[in-house]
């Protein structure tokens, strides 16, 4: 989940892992271009939170994509400045 959403300029991404996993957490714009990698590391099972500060980006819709093990999750978020 992402809270707050819409956000300005930062939001917190919450996710849970059922087992230890390598996590890749990336943000893409509506054109499909990757704008940042927030994580590309091993994480232990459990609940985690990461803060994304988007102060250098333009207002718009962004997609946060979480890849953990063989699972993918996508969350749409809106940056309003």
Sequence positions of predicted segments:
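C-terminal outer-membrane/trafficking sorting elements
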Residues: 1-3, 7-81
């Amino acid at each position: 989940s992402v809270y707050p959403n819409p956000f300005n300029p930062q939001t917190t991404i919450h996710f849970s892992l059922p087992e230890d996993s390598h996590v890749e957490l990336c943000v893409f714009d509506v054109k499909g271009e990757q704008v940042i990698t927030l994580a590309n590391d091993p994480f232990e099972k459990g609940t985690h939170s990461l803060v994304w500060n988007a102060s250098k980006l333009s207002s718009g819709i962004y997609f946060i994509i979480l890849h953990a093990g063989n699972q993918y999750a996508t969350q749409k978020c809106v940056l309003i400045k």
